[in-house]
């Protein structure tokens, strides 16, 4: 079997290919945000590709091109913003709806968008995101100093990630925490300004490659992800894999998260108390969930079954 992987999101496609059997032939069609790369260049690469299954990340132009070029069987993999935001756009919405109807199978990466996908496809399925355990694995914590080392690891985005909630909460315990933040996201400048106005000092870290993110996780005592969606992001999964407890808003309304130990941490007060209490005991519970639901080989095995059924 030959798998043609098209585009990617948070290295999910790359990780899936990496852990597939050597007996499976693999091709990964990637693109940049350049005009040629994401239009005519992309269409040409898809046209020339020959495979037994085509797996496309995001239900946007990549998926639309593959469908129009007759690539079958076609697996469309939604990653959140395509269903939360693009679906409601006057132009992109038509493309997303076309893809939802034309793909042989639709997958979603988080439970919070599954109900949206099922408005168009009753057979849409949640596939947990895999974690590359060769890159992200536990290391012992360094001895904790007077302050707890907190890393805000997700991109600064107030509407989607709730970064402002994290800043306001941390400012109320600023004498007990040493806060670092990675310099990226549409609201990074606003986030830095808010922290400054509240007297919260931030250690600003440069954005690094995916392969080096583990160093940031290992340097923290607690990792903060997002508070706006109610679902687990890759930041949380990778940080837990690195041996660090994660503070994130996971909604109790999603049965897929029944075994995750933190639920409904979505207010400043809850964020504060969870950061204070976050320790090795919390991490062990989170890590148990991770190994049960996101173990890479199990996710790949499940995906290959979907491929075989779709062929």
Model-derived features: positions:
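Donor nucleotide-sugar binding/catalytic pocket of nucleotide-sugar-dependent glycosyltransferases
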Residues: 101-139, 145
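A charged, aromatic-enriched C-terminal amphipathic alpha-helix characteristic of glycosyltransferases
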Residues: 11, 269, 279-308
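Membrane-proximal helix-turn-helix segments that form the acceptor-binding/catalytic region
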Residues: 43-47, 89-106
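Aromatic "clamp/platform" in nucleotide-sugar-dependent glycosyltransferases that forms part
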Residues: 227-228
């Amino acid at each position: 079997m030959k798998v043609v992987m098209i585009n990617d999101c948070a290295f999910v496609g790359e990780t899936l290919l990496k852990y597939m059997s050597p007996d499976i032939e693999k091709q990964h069609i990637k693109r940049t945000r350049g005009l040629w790369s994401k239009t005519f260049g992309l269409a040409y690469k898809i046209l020339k590709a020959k495979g037994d299954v085509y797996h496309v990340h995001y239900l946007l132009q990549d998926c639309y091109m593959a469908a129009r070029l007759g690539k079958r069987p076609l697996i469309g993999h939604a990653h959140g913003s395509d269903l939360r935001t693009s679906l409601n756009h006057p132009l992109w919405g038509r493309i997303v709806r076309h893809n939802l109807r034309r793909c042989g199978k639709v997958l979603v990466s988080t439970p919070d968008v599954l109900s949206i996908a099922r408005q168009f496809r009753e057979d849409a399925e949640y596939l947990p995101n895999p974690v590359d355990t060769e890159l992200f694995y536990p290391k012992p914590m360094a001895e904790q100093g007077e302050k707890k080392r907190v890393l805000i690891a997700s991109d600064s985005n107030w509407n989607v990630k709730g970064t402002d909630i994290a800043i306001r909460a941390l400012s109320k315990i600023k004498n007990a925490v040493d806060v670092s933040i990675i310099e990226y996201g549409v609201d990074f400048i606003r986030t830095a300004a808010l922290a400054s106005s509240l007297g919260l000092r931030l250690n600003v870290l440069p954005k690094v490659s995916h392969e080096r993110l583990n160093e940031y996780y290992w340097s923290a005592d607690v990792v903060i992800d997002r508070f706006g969606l109610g679902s687990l992001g890759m930041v949380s999964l990778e940080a837990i894999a690195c041996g660090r407890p994660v503070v994130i808003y996971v909604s109790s309304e999603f049965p897929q998260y029944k075994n995750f130990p933190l639920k409904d941490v979505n207010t400043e007060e809850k964020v504060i108390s969870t950061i204070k209490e976050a320790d090795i005991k919390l991490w062990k519970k989170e890590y148990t969930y991770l190994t049960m639901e996101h173990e890479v080989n199990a996710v790949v095995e499940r995906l290959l079954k979907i491929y075989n059924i779709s062929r």
